[in-house]
Amino acid sequence: MAKNKSQYDSTLNLPKTLFEMRAGLPKKEPVMLKDWDDNDLYNQLMKHNEGKPQFILHDGPPYANGNIHMGTALNKIIKDIIIREKNMEGYQAPYVPGFDTHGLPIELKALSSVGDKKKDISKLELRQICEKFATEHIDIMSDQFKRLGVIGDFEHPYLTLKPEFEARQIEIFGEMAKKGYIYKGLKPVYWCPDCRTALAEAEIEYGEDDCDSIFVRFHVSQDPNGVLAKYGIPMDKTYFVIWPTTTWTLPANEAICLNGQFEYSFVKIGEEYHIMATDLVKSVMDACHIENYEIVGEPVSGAEFELMRYNHVYLPKEGWVILGDHVTLESGSGCVHTAGGHGVDDFNVCQKYPQVPITVPVDDGGYLTELAGKYAGQRVWAANKTILADLTASGAVMGQVHIKHQYPHCWRCHNPIIFRATEQWFCSIAKFREDVYKAIDTVTWMPDWGHDRMTGMVRDRNDWCISRQRTWGVPIPAFYCKKCGTYHITDATIKAVSALFRKEGSDAWYKYDAEQIIPAGEVCEKCGASEWEKDTDIMDVWFDSGSTHAAVLDERPELRFPADMYMEGGDQFRGWFQSSLLTSVASKGCAPYKSVLCHGWVVDEQGKQMHKSAGNGVEPSEIIKDYGADIIRLWVASSDYTVDVRAGKNIFKQLSEAYRKIRNTARFILGNLDGFDPNTDCVADDQLQDIDRWALAALDDLIVNTNAGYAVYDFNKVYHAVYNFCVVAMSNFYLDVTKDRLYCTNGAARKAAQTTMYKILVALDKIIAPILCFTSQEIWDFMPKTEGMNKYVVFEQMPKAGQYAADDAFKAKWAQLIAVRDEVKKVLEQARAEKLIGASLEASVTLYCNDAVYDLLNSIPMDELADLMIVSHVELVKGEGGAASAVEGLGVAAAHATGDKCERCWKYSASIGSHPAHPTLCARCASVVEA
């Protein structure tokens, strides 16, 4: 306490603890992790909470192909905070981590690992390499999750490559097929030419691309309804004007689509007539830089042009004019280039016209075929330029516009994709869409906009393409009749495939011929034949992870269906949230979750996306090395994770300072509990001072606020409540005010302060335990214990509000006392500036009060009031005087305290030297020393 050594230093009760000021988390945390592992902490916790109500947070499986990043850390820590808090709240909350292990990224990694041999290895060999790769990364990622403090059954995670998982997935497929939700058909799907496979909507990302859109004219060849003659327009000089943005699809053009509700005009340019939507004439002419034109006659309904014919712009074929509601007046010409093989709207409208063929002049790799004529062999992106050049030279192009638009890219290789009609397996969403809407309404969405977002996505989506033309995945369990090609899926075949996969895994599909798998006696329902071939496609990985409600929740005895919560990033509305919802509603008739909680993306300190190329990323391993995992956990808790979360070295540096204040609050209390035995030293409530009761009331408010925050998963609210309590209520006030009786006395007053601090620290440590899992355990290890307290703080129950609650009158009284204290501090600062005093204990304060303020202050013993102000003397005077203050009826005056300074407590007192053996001590300190 003193700068110079005093003979009485040894008589002071100065704080003493081995709990270090410097956290040293990077070194301490691994030691704790080893202890948790050695003592099987997770299973102990589950056993400890056995018989309590369950809370099931179902883990969305991360993809097992790399190190974790800050987004993964955010996700896992949010889940861990929830799991720890629920276990402390009175639930048994198991956590079974999962891993998504099939799919293209792992397959591509496996292929690159074998180099030139990839053409020679069998599918079975490739799958074995993929499995090895996935398994290695499961181990790596599990260790990284555990290093973050995540608690769970990492010894028994669920893996989508496990035989029992694959078997259950086959059964879900079978249940959906039995209800008529699974079919195979020709439809345009997202297709990645580089990965040579179909993609689901959830596997698409959008990026801004440049393209040249052109206005192209197609010559009218037939007018079966006599429309042109009716209006006096010569057919040999008449054209439809279209506006394709993907020139490479022109070889697939089989129709031009108009809207039957719109009006169309004949626009004369020179001696030729061009048909386009009346409302778009000016914009088309402006885009084509055509000034001299004439609109001939009155507008004509689009419906009149139906089934006219036109010549393809360069191929020797005719197309049809058809009608569709998807045609709008937002842009273009109102005459839409229609290639049923390369667009969903195009395909759907062509289905209404049997005479319009579906042409797909593009192969798996994105190369034009002989159907494209002279452009055969060109990749679609290159063909854009050559086709444009040729059409321009031929005079077919009326105008060209350079535009930027959002274009779909493959989320695996990040290259542009195409729409391409191929034979694929689909899940028919339309057949149970209404049931999905009803299921969405039963779910609690957090934030609540999730309800409308999911509803909109389900409403707008097409049928789900669930097949992929790759090797590493769960095979589509379908057989084909060798004689007629009809596909064959029955209860018996599903049961046989599921049993085989449960026994040997899905590799068995590649080990055995169809006849060795399909049950005996199965015959083709179309032709009666009984010779079979196996389907060669695998399932979309979103069907894998979307089956976890059955393969995990139903199968694991410690879990149950439906889960209480799914919690992932916002991108999973089109991913796991949705695929799980669809398969669950389709197979079980209800949602797989009671609530859905979502978080945002992690961005850099400026709010920009993190990219390695930009050098603005930060890795969890870096932060752990510099600060420890608890600082990452504090970052998660301090953030509003419902929006994008900023991360960067400056942010973590600031958080380490906030962490230090919380830690030092605990350290100060631990230091003052040295020698305190809560089993024998705690005093009764009636022995507490008023300020102790205030501190406990502040603790009760903290419990109320943090419990409310945890209840709605608002950890930001918890963090701010804890931080403000530690800094404002404790460090800046209560702990400061109580130093004198802690350091300088040994009686009931000191034990009252210790009792209060002990109760505060026990509750505070439990409150921070879900967030600062390492630091809270370190505090717990140093804390004196009462009987019945557990070795691990996570085994404790969260503190309940109400035990230390104060009435409104008490709170109002102390709010006014603190306001008086603040006014005294202002006057002391002024006295210090005027060199009247140095430390506040050199001051004597006179408080001039009206009756109300006098009664308030006089209700506190004068020595306690002096301690509250941290001065040596306080005098109350009724009446006006001193410096005016913000407290009505209060004036404050400060003077240097009279008497001498006590060598032990530093207070000024007239009683110095009253004890002959201690001439430099005040009477109080002398009696303590002599005791």
Segments and roles (model prediction):
Residues 100, 189, 193, 199-207, ...:
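Acidic, turn-prone loop/beta-hairpin segments
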Residues 196, 469, 485, 528-529, ...:
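Cys/His-coordinated zinc-binding microdomains
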Residues 2-272, 339-344, 349-352, 357-374, ...:
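N-terminal, positively charged nucleic-acid-binding surface of large information/translation enzymes
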Residues 71-83, 90-92, 99-100, 165-168, ...:
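Structured ligand/cofactor/substrate-binding pocket environments in proteins
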Residues 189, 407, 478, 521, ...:
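Residues immediately within or flanking Cys/His clusters that coordinate Zn2+
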Residues 912-920:
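Short linker/helix segments within small regulatory modules
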Residues 145, 168, 464, 657-670, ...:
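Core structural elements
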Residues 192, 410, 481, 524-527, ...:
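Short cysteine-rich clusters marking metal-coordination/redox-active sites
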